[in-house]
Amino acid sequence: NLVQFSYLIQCANTGKRASYHYADYGCYCGAGGSGTPVDELDRCCKIHDNCYGQAEKMGCYPKLTMYNYYCGTQSPTCDNKTGCQRYVCACDLEAAKCFARSPYNNKNYNIDTSKRCK
């Protein structure tokens, strides 16, 4: 679910950037999404949005699905055997790892999406 996703983000980036920094970034980080991603980090969000879309097609509710994960010393891992929990955790885990390895550009935070996301 979205709360667990927030924790996975913190785990993957070892607390270097608070999760809320990703809630209004570029064209895809946060609610909705359109146009061309502005950078690598925004592409992570587009991929995550698409992953959630696939989860919904499978009959899952990704924003609400609770799953099991472990925040280890190397990186977070998912601990779910089957179904929606496994799929949604994988979506969130891949996005969190993608966020951690992608540069954050302050100029792409809280942009005018009506102009830059066509």
Curated annotation (Swiss-Prot):
Record key words, sorted: Calcium, Disulfide bond, Hydrolase, Lipid degradation, Lipid metabolism, Metal-binding, Secreted
An example Gene Ontology biological process: lipid catabolic process
Principal EC category: hydrolase
Localisation per UniProt entry: Secreted
Note on cofactor: Binds 1 Ca(2+) ion.
Family: Belongs to the phospholipase A2 family. Group I subfamily. D49 sub-subfamily.
Catalytic activity line of the entry: a 1,2-diacyl-sn-glycero-3-phosphocholine + H2O = a 1-acyl-sn-glycero-3-phosphocholine + a fatty acid + H(+)
Tissues where the protein occurs: Expressed by the venom gland.
Quaternary structure and partners: Monomer.
Record organism: Laticauda semifasciata (Black-banded sea krait)
Enzyme Commission no: 3.1.1.4
Protein purpose: PLA2 catalyzes the calcium-dependent hydrolysis of the 2-acyl groups in 3-sn-phosphoglycerides.
Residues engaged in binding Ca(2+): 28, 30, 32, 49
Cofactor(s) the protein requires to work: Ca(2+)
Record's keyword annotation contains Calcium: yes
GO molecular function, one term: calcium-dependent phospholipase A2 activity
SMART domains reported in the protein's UniProt record: PA2c (SM00085)
Gene Ontology CC: extracellular region
Transmembrane intervals: none
Disulfide bonds: 11-71, 27-117, 29-45, 44-98, 51-91, 60-84, 78-89
Active site per database record: 48, 92
Name this protein carries in UniProt: Basic phospholipase A2 4
One matching Pfam family: Phospholip_A2_1
